[in-house]
Amino acid sequence: MLKLKKLVATALAGVMMAVAAGCGGGAADSGSSAPAGNSGGKRVGVAMPTQSSQRWIQDGANMKEKLEALGYQVDLQYAEDDVQAQVSQIENMITNGANCLVVASIDSSALVNALAQAKANNIPVIAYDRLLMDTDSVSYYATFDNKGVGTLIGKYVEKQLGLAEGKGPYNVEFFAGSPDDNNAHFLNDGLFEVLQKYIDKGQLVVPSKQTDFDTICTLRWSQETAQRRMEDIISGYYTDGKKLDAVISPFDGISYGIAAALEGAGYQVGKNWPLITGQDAELMATKNIISGKQTMTVFKDTRTLADKCVTMVQAVLEGKDPEINDTTSYNNHKLVVPSYLCTPVAVDKSNYQKELIDSGYYKADQLK
């Protein structure tokens, strides 16, 4: 998703693994083994999408550390947003004797055949944060409440703009996540359940008229793609002095692209800078919130998600039923996948200290 090497380098300072920053090229192998404890030396394959986003680096590092502490051997792989590389990595994990797979997919529907191999070998599969679609080979799903993320963003915008009190009209533009990531659809649904009524009432005006998902989606959650689209929106609809009040972004990386386009067009923080949302509470995004370049983000504590996924792995490998709190929401076209949903939190300048620093997610000196 994000391709800023400096951001990745900064993020690594707080992550307990040494990986190379950057993107493109070949997929990364971060596999290692740990001494067997109560796990009986069982092997867990962890397939992550990319190292180009801070959150996936943290997710992988957290799970690897926690699984190894329990005595599991861990094969952690990053596919650098290369779908075929991820397919090959999963197939190799199966060949190398994985007893359980944890998969955060690049393309949610592209792993059907590889996962069928896992099922044929009686290997349980846990979908991690991104639902695996069109397969009956997935056992469980660990994620955040993705529709709730969209609702949080929508409610934040509603409050900040005073929409419930009838204020407006405001000029806004919308961005969505990657069309091949089921989370993007859930988030967008939650967002528009809050904001669509204000569009209908004329309190929110979209000068570009771009609101349908197929138009506002951003393949691979790409910062560069978002920047180009924002540049086109500015040049096409805001050259006559029209004020841009808000840009609704579903991800911090997309927000960086939006901000870059605005800066390139002469927008200035504290003068004509719009409200900008985001998701993931990345280090750079948090710095941008402090400086005013980004208004808010949604914090999804990856430590909590990693903890939950690790307990799922442990339960499954011990022949137990893992804790589940949702058995209705996540239909992948083949089955409703039993899920555990963690709770996201909206973060802005008013509460980043409490949520991100006091909780130990970041250290204060990282935000200087």
Model-inferred region functions:
Residues 18-22:
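C-terminal motif of bacterial Sec signal peptides marking the signal peptidase cleavage site
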